[in-house]
């Protein structure tokens, strides 16, 4: 559900690419990663790194309304059949420094956050209690 191809245009600014990405647009939700993560993570720190031709964006901070630390890892990889497009998908989520989640769990957590934002919820701290 979160594996979506985006126009790449040859850029390597992984943070800007992920921030602008609307992973649920095909389902009528036009929120970007920046909209959601900046809303629910206190003073989020956006960082990127590369491993070969794959980029990773790490977003970390404290969940608003909570004292829990969160780390979101998003993978940006080239599409094998189209050099102008990339696949952007959640890799894992870490809470309070515990072991990273599975990709499926990361997708579920992010889906919940996107839907909460669409409903206008001020915070999602209760979800992580």
Model-derived segments and their meaning:
Residues 1-129:
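Cystatin/cathelin-like cysteine-protease inhibitor module
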